[in-house]
A protein has these predicted regions:
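Conserved catalytic-core segment of NTP-binding enzymes
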Residues: 75, 80-164
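Generic hydrophobic alpha-helical segments
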Residues: 62-66, 119-122, 171-175
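Short, surface-exposed amphipathic charged segments that create phosphate/polyanion-binding patches used
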Residues: 50, 150-151, 174-175
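Short, high-confidence coil segments that cap the C-terminus of an alpha-helix
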Residues: 69-74
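N-terminal phosphate/diphosphate-binding loop that engages ATP/GTP or pyrophosphate donors
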Residues: 1-56, 60, 65-68
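Beta-strand-loop-alpha "switch" segments that mediate conformational coupling across diverse proteins
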Residues: 44, 157-174
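General beta-strand structural signal in soluble alpha/beta enzymes
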Residues: 1-3, 32-36, 76-80, 107, ...
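Conserved nucleotide-binding/hydrolysis micro-motifs of P-loop NTPases
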Residues: 6-8, 113-114, 142-143, 172-173
Length: 175
């Protein structure tokens, strides 16, 4: 597993919440620096947070590190940061990182109002950029759904040919 850059990390000497969850879920033996090379305090797009903190995100180093992880593992998940079109480093977007690695995308969507537009735009951008799409999933579906949350999966399924792979419930605590 890898999260190339995580922002909004209270203590950048440790893993942020996302990277820590990835490490735990994968039972990974990789070091914190391998899993999340750039941990940034400011809750901003990675390149913006890095600039605020006077840190330079080395895009080529990230690619090399990702390729080493991919080459040494049978299965690898690389979690993006903020979305496909979020600036990662300099003029490079998360989409550029995905394209360079040639990995299929799993688009993770929130079920709330606005997700149909957000998800379709992401899938459209990925297709336009020639990125392979494994599918999409709705994450953190609440037990008590709003009408928008209740209709999200069906609405998306009628508007895209990409595969809905899962609808995962919101869980609390140690569930």
């Amino acid at each position: 597993v890898m999260k190339p850059a995580e922002s909004g990390v209270a203590n950048p000497t440790a893993l942020g919440q996302d990277a820590a969850l990835l490490k735990w879920a994968a039972n990974s033996r990789l070091s914190n620096d391998e899993i999340a090379p750039y941990r940034l305090k400011a809750a901003l797009a990675p390149s913006v947070a890095a600039a605020e903190e006077k840190i330079r995100i080395d895009y080529n180093r990230l690619l090399q590190q990702a390729r080493e992880i991919i080459d040494s593992h049978e299965f690898t998940i690389i979690e993006g940061a903020g979305g496909l079109m979020v600036p990662l480093s300099g003029g490079f977007l998360m989409a550029d990182f995905a394209a360079a690695l040639k990995l299929p995308l799993l688009v993770v969507c929130r079920p709330a109002l606005g997700t149909v537009n957000h998800t379709l735009l992401t899938l459209f951008a990925a297709r336009t950029m020639g990125l392979p799409i494994a599918g999409y999933m709705l994450n953190r579906m609440p037990k008590q759904k709003t009408l928008a949350e209740e209709k999200a999966a069906h609405t998306l399924a009628t508007l895209t040919t990409d595969e809905l792979l899962a609808v995962l419930p919101d869980v609390e605590g140690d569930e």
